[in-house]
């Protein structure tokens, strides 16, 4: 037991430590934030007991930090524990439950577990709508998060509708410089990019960049995201030199923030590789693709969708250079991962089969090409029938 005076001291210490945790997290100082979050958990357990909501708050903070650091298993475990404590103390409909559900869903998204994430995002959104109403900023954030998931699942019309809802709410609340509206603008730009509407996408990306720069400062991870997305448009438009310049800015910010072996760096290496391929610098492209694959394998693991993307990209490079044996190895490895993660009847599996079929056709391996092409068509027919 602690005395009343000790309790007051610990109470102030927990408040201060939690504040510093959040401040460091927002500034992208994740190692410092993690140590402070661990300390706040210890303080909360000592003064309030292991089942206190303040323990849950501290656990939730640490889970968010671990998520951005790529420590997904630890993040998931902490988030589940925090959710259990909150539900036991506050009941299933409290707004704090919505926050924890949202964070756990975000961890599942980071791990590529999209099916597990959707019901959590939906439950979180329902709680927010009930607690705050449909035009509240918290509800807008809920729309944005669910839209992010739909975008990743290629459910673009549903995603666009939710992004526009979120932006409307932010603007109604005169919150046009809030980082969250930057997120919604950035993600709506992704939809325009996918549809080939590059001018519209670039305008939205630049708006997001300006908002984040004011709200977060020039070296914040969100700035790296904005620069990365602007670079992506330049790449798609064939402006490879400008794209490479911006991607290297992204790499500099992310290496400073996360270290050299973070999964965000894997994506940037992949993007630089694509630029190098566009410039005809094939040896450099191969080197950067391999770097992306190695980092992804060591951080996200081989069952993550990004890993398949990197495998397919290096396979495409080998196919273009008529190094068919190496291309086949990476295409097949990507196909096996997709079948394991999504099942054998997923459209992404069909696309991977078509990549192999196209390569076999160019080699004159007509029977192999026909076999994979027919399998892909069968999957697409089933998908259309079930949609």
Language-model-detected regions and their locations in the chain:
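Conserved alpha-helical positions within TPR/SEL1-like repeat arrays
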Residues: 15-26, 53-68, 79, 95-110, ...
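Alpha-helical segment of the N-proximal tetratricopeptide repeat
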Residues: 12-39, 43-46, 68
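TPR/TPR-like (Sel1-like) alpha-helical repeat modules
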Residues: 332, 361-384
């Amino acid at each position: 037991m602690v005395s009343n005076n000790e309790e007051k001291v610990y109470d102030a210490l927990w408040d201060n430590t939690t504040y510093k945790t959040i401040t460091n997290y927002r500034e992208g100082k994740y190692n410092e934030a993690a140590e402070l979050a661990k300390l706040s958990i210890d303080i909360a357990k000592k003064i309030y007991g292991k089942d206190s909501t303040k323990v849950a708050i501290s656990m939730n903070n640490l889970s968010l930090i671990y998520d951005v650091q790529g420590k997904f298993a630890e993040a998931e475990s902490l988030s589940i524990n925090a959710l259990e404590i909150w539900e036991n103390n506050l009941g299933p409909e409290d707004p704090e439950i919505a926050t924890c559900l949202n964070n756990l869903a975000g961890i599942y998204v980071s791990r590529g577990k999209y099916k597990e994430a959707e019901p959590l995002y939906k439950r979180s959104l329902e709680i927010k709508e009930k607690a705050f109403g449909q035009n509240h900023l918290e509800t807008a954030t809920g729309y944005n998060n669910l839209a992010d998931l739909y975008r990743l699942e290629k459910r673009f019309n549903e995603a666009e509708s939710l992004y526009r809802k979120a932006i409307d709410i932010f603007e109604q609340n005169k919150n046009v410089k809030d980082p969250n509206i930057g997120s919604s603008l950035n993600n709506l730009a992704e939809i325009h990019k996918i549809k080939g509407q590059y001018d519209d996408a670039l305008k939205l990306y630049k708006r997001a960049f300006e908002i984040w720069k004011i709200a977060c400062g020039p070296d914040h991870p969100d700035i790296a995201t904005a620069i990365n997305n602007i670079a992506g448009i330049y790449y798609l438009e064939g402006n490879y030199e400008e794209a490479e310049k911006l991607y290297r800015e992204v790499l500099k910010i992310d290496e400073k923030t996360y270290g050299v072996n973070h999964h965000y760096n894997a994506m940037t290496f992949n993007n630089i590789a694509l630029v190098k391929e566009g410039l005809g610098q094939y040896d450099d492209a191969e080197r950067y693709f391999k770097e992306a694959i190695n980092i992804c394998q060591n951080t996200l693991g081989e069952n993550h969708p990004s890993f398949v993307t990197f495998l397919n990209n290096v396979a495409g490079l080998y196919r273009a250079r008529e190094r068919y044996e190496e291309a086949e190895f990476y295409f097949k490895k990507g196909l096996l991962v997709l079948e394991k993660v999504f099942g054998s009847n997923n459209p992404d599996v069909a696309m991977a089969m078509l990549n192999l079929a196209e390569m076999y056709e160019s080699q004159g391996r007509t029977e192999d090409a026909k076999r994979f092409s027919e399998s892909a068509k069968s999957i697409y027919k089933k998908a259309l029938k079930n949609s």
